[in-house]
Design a protein with these regions (language model features):
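Alpha-helix capping at helix-to-loop junctions
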Residues: 106-113, 143, 157
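Active-site-proximal helix-loop elements at catalytic-domain edges
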Residues: 17-22, 105, 109-111
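Acidic catalytic patch
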Residues: 109-124
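Soluble or luminal CAZymes and related metallo-dependent hydrolases
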Residues: 16, 23-27, 96-99
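Short, contiguous alpha-helical
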Residues: 2-7, 21-25, 29-35, 40-83, ...
Length: 165
């Protein structure tokens, strides 16, 4: 794919949409393994230094990823929802995580390459481009996973290797 820049020069694509989704899904698979590594009670209650429990961070990630990609693909805005019924069961969170992964995959293929440069207001609140929104989704997940690594280590649990995506 070639893009013509404003000054008339051509730019070649650095990463394809397929490469980007594969990269993100590698991160999501790693985050799933981090969720699995937590003892049930600690997943919902363990905190350090005023940070939220990892379960709350995962609720945020669930509220952003699947619904965000769906909004980008369909153009239909929905309010940001970071609260999901889980009954304090890690198995339910993992089920929701897998559903979100499927939702991302379903809607990702509907995003046309030219859409990545479009300006949007995701969830009716956050302005940027499609690609900057997706980068935020990924960066936010990495950020919260890093917090979870600190939690796991404080519990005496070796987290999954960060590079095994």
């Amino acid at each position: 794919m070639e893009t013509t820049l404003n000054n008339g020069t051509k730019s070649h694509e650095v990463i394809t949409p397929t490469d980007l989704i594969n990269h993100w899904q590698g991160h999501r698979a790693l985050t799933r393994r981090v969720i699995e590594a937590f003892p049930e009670e600690a997943f919902f209650n363990h905190t350090i230094g005023g940070m939220r429990p990892f379960s709350d961070m995962v609720m945020e990630l669930l509220g952003i990823a699947g619904p965000g990609i769906k909004e980008i693909a369909t153009g239909k805005q929905a309010p940001l929802n970071e609260h999901f019924e889980h009954g304090n069961k890690k198995a339910k969170i993992l089920e929701l995580w897998d559903e979100a992964t499927n939702e991302i995959n379903t809607y990702w293929v509907q995003i046309k390459p030219e859409q990545f440069q479009q300006h949007i207001k995701i969830f009716g609140q956050y302005e940027g481009t499609v690609y900057s929104s997706i980068f935020y989704f990924i960066d936010n997940e990495i950020h919260h996973r890093g917090q979870a690594y600190v939690y796991l280590r404080s519990l005496g649990i070796e987290p999954p290797a960060f590079y095994e995506r």
